[in-house]
Amino acid sequence: MTTQAPLTGLLPLNPQQLARLQAATTDFTPEQLAWVSGYFWGVLNPRSGADAVARAPERGSLGITLISASQTGNARRVAEALRDDLLAVNLNVNLVNAGDYKFKQIACEKLLVVVTSTQGEGEPPEEAVALHKFLFSKKAPRLNNTAFAVFSLGDTSYEFFCQAGKDFDNKLAELGGERLLDRVDADVEYQTVAAQWRARIVDVLKSRTPVTTPVPSVVSGAVNEIHTSPYTKEAPLRASLSVNQKITGRNSEKDVRHIEIDLGDSGLCYQPGDALGVWYQNDPALVKEIVELLWLKGDEPVAVDGKLLPLTEALQWHFELTVNTAGIVENYATLTRSEFLLPLVGDKAQLQHYAAATPIADMLRFSPSQLDADALVGLLRPLTPRLYSIASSQAEVENEVHLTVGVVRYDIEGRARAGGASSFLADRVDDEGEVRVFIEHNDNFRLPTNPETPIIMIGSGTGIAPFRAFIQQRAADEASGKNWLFFGNPHFTEDFLYQVEWQRYVKEGLLSRIDLAWSRDQKEKIYVQDKLRERGAELWRWINDGAHIYVCGDANRMAKDVEQALLEVIVEFGGMDLESADEYLSELRVARRYQRDVY
C-alpha cells in the first residue's frame, strides 16, 4: 500500500525516523495500519486494570466474550487458560473481568462464556455481584441471539455448591440464550475437569466462529493485569517465619496472631488489598490419630500425583484432613455400610449439617471401620492453600509480609481440634521455620488512585488486616484524603487488634475518624452495622463527597448486615426508596467505590 507523505514540519519525527517508519509500513494493508496505530496508542497510554474499560463488541461480531468472575484466583486462572487456548487456534476472544464488564451490552453478545466461582452462601464472587443483580432484575434484556457456556468452580464442603454458576447458567437460558455446552461444576480439585471442559468448548467455538488473525484484546480489567513473579501457587516461595505474636488478651475467647514472614531477597511484591496464599502441613498428631483409628500402620504406600509415598507423609503433606464434606461422609457411609451414617445419605440437609459439625477424625471415631490405605486417600480431597488478607504495605515493611490470623480452635467431646493452616502458623512453625507462600493478587480491593479521595473502612475481627495495609500505604504516600475506620470485636480490653497503632494514627491525624463496636462489653450487643446507622448523616456526607467504601470480614453475617445498614443510611439520608438505594449501591460497586473482601 502506498501512503501519501505527510508534511514533515508538522510531525515530531526527524526525516530519518519518518523514512524508517514509511519503509516499515509500505506494504501494510489498511487493517494492519489501523492495528499498528492502536498498538502504539496502547503503548503510549497504558491502563491499569482498575481504570480499563472493556471493549464493547460490534453488533453482529462473532468474537467471543469471555467473562472471568473470580474470588480467590482459580476462576481467573481457568479463564486465562481458555483465552490462551482460543488464541492458539486463531479465534478472536476478549477476556474481561466481571467487575469491568459493561453488562448492559450483553444483548449484543453472540458468543458468551462465563467462568465463575461461588462465595459465602451461594453468592457470586464480589466482582460479579453487579452483573448477577442486573441479570436477575427487570432490566435484563432478552438474549435470543446469544449462545453461552458456563464453567462453575466451588467447594463441596459448602451447602450451596457452585450456586453462582447455576444461577448464571439458568438465568442466561431463561432470558433466551442458547447453551453451547451443559454447565460443568468443578470441586476444589478442578484442574483435570477444567482442562477437559476447555478442550470441548474450544471445539464448539471453532465450529461457531470463523478463524481469523486475532486482534489483541483491549485491556479489560484485572484479569489482564500482568503480575510477573517466579513464585506461584504451583511453585511457592520458601520464606521464613520471623514473628508469631498473640495480639488478643489472655482472657479473650479468640486466639489471634500477628504473623510476620520474611521474604528475603526473593523480589516477591504485593499491594495493599492482596492476599497471601499459605501452603501448610497437617498436624502429625492428627495424622497419627487417623491412621490408628483405621488400624493402619502408616507406612503403606499410596499413589500421589503419580508417585508412591508412605501413607503418613501423604496425609501430612497432600490431603485435606480438617474440613469434612457431605461427599466424604456419603462415600464413607457407602464404603463401610455404617448403620449410623447411611440414613443421613438420603437427607441432604442432615448430611450437610453432620459434615459441617463433625471433623473427619471424629467421623472415623464415632463410626469405626477398617479401610485400607488406598480407600482412605480415595475418600479425601487434596490439600489446598489457605488465603489470608495481607496486613502490611511494602512501602513500610519492605521485604516482609504481615498477616492477622485467627486461630481456629474448638473441642469435640473433650478432644481439641484446630484449623489446618491457622494452627500450622500458630503452633507448628518454629522461629525462622519455613513457610511456603505466594501472592494472590486482588485487583478488586484497591485504594483509590487519587490520594485526595476519602476512604471508609469497615471491618470486624481479623477483617482489620487489609485496613492496616491501607493506612500504612496512605501514610507512605502522604495521601491527603480522609480516612475513617469502623471496627468491631467482642471486648475492648481483650480484642482491640493493633490498638496502639490505631491510636497513634488518630493522634497523628492520619486516621480522621474511628468508631468502635464492642459486642460483649454491655448488655445490649453493638456491632459495626449499628455504628454505621448511628453515624448515618456523616457517613452520607462522606459518600456524597466521593468516599470509597471498603468492607472486610465474614461474608455470611457481618458483610450482609453491613450492606443492609448502608442501604438504610442511603434511604434515610439520600432521600431514596429501597430499590433506588440498591441501584445506587450497585453503581458505587461498578465505579469501584464499594469494594468488599469477604470470606
UniProtKB/Swiss-Prot annotation:
Q: Where is the FAD-binding FR-type domain?
A: 234-448
* Pathway, per record: Sulfur metabolism; hydrogen sulfide biosynthesis; hydrogen sulfide from sulfite (NADPH route): step 1/1
Chain sites annotated for binding NADP(+): 519-520, 525-529, 561
State the reactions this protein catalyses. Answer: hydrogen sulfide + 3 NADP(+) + 3 H2O = sulfite + 3 NADPH + 4 H(+)
Please name the Pfam families in this protein's record: FAD_binding_1 (PF00667), Flavodoxin_1 (PF00258), NAD_binding_1 (PF00175)
Role, per record:
Component of the sulfite reductase complex that catalyzes the 6-electron reduction of sulfite to sulfide. This is one of several activities required for the biosynthesis of L-cysteine from sulfate. The flavoprotein component catalyzes the electron flow from NADPH -> FAD -> FMN to the hemoprotein component.
Record: residues binding FAD: 322, 356, 386-389, 404-406, 410, 419-422, 599
| Residue ranges the record marks as coiled coil | none
Q: Name one GO molecular function term.
A: sulfite reductase (NADPH) activity
Keyword Flavoprotein: yes or no? yes
Q: How does it assemble?
A: Alpha(8)-beta(8). The alpha component is a flavoprotein, the beta component is a hemoprotein.
NCBIfam families documented for this protein: cysJ, PRK10953.1
Q: Which UniProt keywords apply?
A: Amino-acid biosynthesis, Cysteine biosynthesis, Electron transport, FAD, Flavoprotein, FMN, NADP, Oxidoreductase, Transport
Q: What positions does the entry give for FMN binding?
A: 70-75, 117-120, 153-162
- CC annotations in GO: cytosol
**Protein's name in the database:** Sulfite reductase [NADPH] flavoprotein alpha-component
List the cofactors: FAD; FMN
The record describes how the cofactor is bound as:
Binds 1 FAD per subunit.
**Lineage, uppermost ranks:** Bacteria, Pseudomonadati, Pseudomonadota, Gammaproteobacteria, Enterobacterales
* This enzyme's EC code(s): 1.8.1.2
Organism (species): Salmonella arizonae (strain ATCC BAA-731 / CDC346-86 / RSK2980)
What GO terms describe the biological role, i.e. biological process, of this protein? Answer: cysteine biosynthetic process; hydrogen sulfide biosynthetic process; sulfate assimilation
Domain Flavodoxin-like residue range list: 64-202
Superkingdom to which the source organism belongs: Bacteria
**What does the sequence similarity comment in the record state about its family?**
Belongs to the NADPH-dependent sulphite reductase flavoprotein subunit CysJ family. In the N-terminal section; belongs to the flavodoxin family.
